[in-house]
Each structure stands twice: as structure tokens, then as C-alpha cells.
Curated annotation (Swiss-Prot):
Cited Pfam families: F-box, FBA_1
Biological source species: Arabidopsis thaliana (Mouse-ear cress)
Domain F-box: 1-45
Signal peptide: none
This protein's name: Putative F-box protein At3g25460
InterPro entries attached to this UniProt entry: F-box-assoc_dom_typ1, F-box-assoc_interact_dom, F-box-like_dom_sf, F-box_dom, Gal_Oxase/kelch_b-propeller, SCF_F-box_component
Amino acid sequence: MMMPELPEDLLVEILCRVPATSLKRLRSTCKLWNHLYNDKRFKSKHCHKAPRQSLILMWKNFGFSSISINLQRVSPIEVTGELNLIDHHSSLGMFRNSPLCQTSGLLLCVNVEKINTRLVVWNPCTGKTKWIQHRRMGYICNYALGSYQDKKSDNNSYKILSHGIYGGQEFEIYEINSNSWRILDVTVDSSLYIENVSLKGKTYWFATDGNDKPCDLFLICFDYTTERFERLCLPYQIPYFRNTSLSVVKEEKLSVLLQPSLTSKTQIWVTNKIGEAKVLSWIKFLTVDLKPEIKYGIKFLVDEENKVLVYEQNFVINGKNNMIYVVGEDNEVREVVFRVGLKPLFFYYVPSLTQIRQGND
């Protein structure tokens, strides 16, 4: 007995609640499902109603992989999938792993070939890309990707923020909707760190006031709607930190790792859900005793459910390099066997059907 066909409006209501990764596998089931997968209105509905499934992505050996880390026991990292950037202009093999920024299921990668800088905004779930030429040749920049609510379409739209790394604080904005760069009329007196993360329409950096005297570290965020910077306080203030790092918790919260100088005691703090309150508040997640030989460059993830910190270190330490560590409330540090390439960079990624506007779309 054949199953009756569902009305299209009912099918839409069902499929818009299916996670993006599962929907990607289902698109080959029939022409209608494949059509919905590419339909702009369906994608917009899906972004609002579909459950968020967080993956761990790793950049390694000039490519991306999805990975699984067993938090309960010591076991090798499992590579669960490979993600390929397909475009006739270039290949991911020519991309450097830093800077790398992501928001709303989109990744921003930067390719520098001699004096030519090219950027690509990429949705790994849909495979769609948008290639962008930076108008300044031979100018070394830091980049960030963020979103804002477009008043005309009432949909999320995207901008890229760039600023010089070595000298100068001139900021430029690239609007994906208009395919154009423009200089941003803002002045920032602080010195921004290179590392940044984007969350809920804003990008965050560590920053200092940039004078020669000991000065407190703080956060600066850039709002892509107002195109203005805002200064934010960290959980506590001291003149010197040995280690600092930023991370995003499943596209909902901001997390910071703070290790004061002359100690291995490290605190991990997590904010309230970004966007749900006007005031940013901090909750101490863990205090752990990281190895004192850990140097600058630590990257980390927070697993709130299992109450553990996962961090990696790319420097050679006691003959070891590229190690991943898992540490929990018991302060027991476990080394995870790492066999997936050199100089990894890993982060939480939430797949989505987010569209990338192309030219006259």
C-alpha cells in the first residue's frame, strides 16, 4: 500500500523543523524536497524553526573536518566527515588558518597570494560561496564577519569588517548586499588583539588602552547594525594576563579563558545568553590548574552539559605538539591522542541553510 502524498504546506512545516545536516541528506529523496532545500522562503523559515545542532569543526592540513571527542575516556579523536570548499578560483589548500571567523553557519576564510588578498564567505552545509577581492593590495589586515537585520527584507544580512594589523586603526566595511567596500567613520583609541569571535550580530576582541603603563584588559565589541564599537568589562581586572582566549558556546554565549601571570590557575567564565539581557553578566564556569608551560596561543571549547573544558596547544612542549586536553571539575587533565594533522584549529559550528547573497539576487 502506497503512502499518500502530504500537502506541500504541511511538508514545509515538517521539514523546516529538521536539522540542517539531516535535511541536506534528505534533499536527494525527491525533486520537491530538493526544490525546498534551495527555496529562499523555506531557508528563512528553516533558520527560525529548525533545532540547532552543534558540531566541532577542525581546520587541519589546509582542510576542514568534523570531529568527535570522547569526553569520558582517553581515546583518539574520530574524524566524522570532511568538508571541501569547491570553487574554480582556488582551493582551500591555499588558505591560511588564521584569521578565520564564523557566524550563523557561515565561515570567512582569507587567502593571501603575494600581494593579493582574497576572501571567501562559505556555507559548508549548502556548499555555497561568495568570493571577495579586498581593494587594498599588500595591506595586511584582520577580518571579522557579522550579521545585522536588513530593514527592507527583514532578513539577516552580512558585513565584513577589516582593519590593519600593523599600524593604523582605519576600519573598512564590506556589505555583501551591495558588493562594495567603504571606509568606516569611527575612531578607536584602544589596541585590539588579533583574535576575535562573532556572535549574535557582534564581533568581540580583547583590547587594552595601548599606553606604556600597566593597563587592564577589557573587551571591545562591534555592532554591525549601528556600526559602532562598545567597551565591555571582563569578570575581573588585573594588569597582566599570561594567557587569554575567546570562545563561543553553541552560538548562544561568550566565554573567556583568563590565566593571570605567574600562576597556572586558570579561570573560564561564561556569559548569560547574548541578546536576552541588556547587561552582560559573567558566571565562573571552571577554575583549573593548567600546566604552567602552556604558552600564548591556547584555543578552547566549553561543554556546559559535561562541565568540561577542551583545549589545544600548538606549541612544542616537552617534545609533544598539537595536543588536545580535556579537564573537568576534578581538575584531572587528560591528553587526547591526536592524529589528524599539523597546526589544528577547532571550534563549535552550527550548520544552517543561511543564504549568501550573490550580486543581483
